[in-house]
A protein has these predicted regions:
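Short aromatic-acidic-glycine turn motif
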Residues: 103-115
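Short beta-strand elements
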Residues: 28-56, 204-236
């Protein structure tokens, strides 16, 4: 140990394969401590899983503190997004094939906080083009209860950049259609599904899924798990026309527990 106090920083993952370096990197110097990350369409493209990126810091450490052991408490920098579903009526059944989220920021830089108990900050440039990330595909999920939610992605959560989502303003003339929502970079869900009520098909058929679109807005927070329960009734066409009774949301935010990993470092 040197005589002066030291600042320690740790990052998880610490190293990545060469082909992943374009998506993830970190920097820790005297003046700059930041993480750059680009989310991948993990469940659509399927080429790579997203990293649960974490950091830890211990500043002003000396040899006399903790018997010369540096203790780290890792914190998540991304937001976790999970979906469930219910039906609006007890005699309704929904079969889900695909869910996608359109038009959210998927890349940015996270600057570490000045102190370990701080929260840090994200900066992301505005979207340059419309895009969609997959929640599930080829899902074959049946939802047939209006009281108990059916799990969709609790075990396969999305990891996304924290941000405020602007929902598709389908009621406004300037953004009535899906194309206009894309041009305005407004957020919505794309859902390929079949909807039946008392056995009769209201959307799709026994052999065909139909696609509906649902305005989607919220604020994703760093280190939080956001759970969305879709209450199925219907949605909108790509021209912004209502299909049946549009889907409602029941949103919940829970703590995504920090990793209490004590990593012992003895310089």
């Amino acid at each position: 140990w040197p005589s002066e106090a030291l600042d320690f920083y740790a990052f998880n993952p610490g190293t990545v394969s060469e082909d992943m370096m374009v998506f993830y990197s970190w920097e820790a110097t005297k003046d700059v401590q930041k993480i750059s990350y680009t989310c991948m369409d993990e469940y659509g493209a399927g080429t790579h899983a997203n990293y649960d990126v974490m950091y830890a810091m211990a500043k002003g450490q000396t040899k006399d503190m903790n018997n010369g052991i540096v203790k780290f408490n890792f914190k998540h920098i991304l937001s976790q997004v999970v979906f469930k579903a219910k039906t609006q009526y007890d005699n309704m059944q929904v079969d889900i094939d695909v869910i996608k989220i359109h038009n959210f920021k998927f890349a940015g830089a996270f600057t570490l906080p000045a102190a370990a108990d701080g929260t840090g900050s994200w900066s992301s440039s505005d979207l340059a083009f419309p895009h969609a990330f997959t929640v599930v595909k080829n899902a074959n999920i049946t939802v047939n209860s209006n009281t108990e939610a059916t799990d969709i992605t609790t075990n396969t959560p999305m990891l996304n950049i924290p941000q405020e989502l602007t929902a598709w303003k389908v009621s406004e003339t300037a953004t009535k259609s899906k194309l206009e929502a894309d041009n305005a970079k407004q957020c919505y869900l794309e859902i390929a599904c079949k909807i039946r009520q008392s056995g009769a098909y209201l959307l799709g058929s026994a052999s065909e899924y139909k696609t509906i679109y649902v305005p989607f807005g919220d604020t994703w927070e760093q280190g939080k798990r956001h759970i969305y329960t879709l209450i199925f009734g219907g949605g909108y066409t790509d021209q912004g026309e209502a299909v049946l009774n549009p889907i409602q949301f029941d949103a919940e935010t829970t703590g995504w527990v920090d990793a209490n990993s004590n990593v012992n470092v003895k310089p």
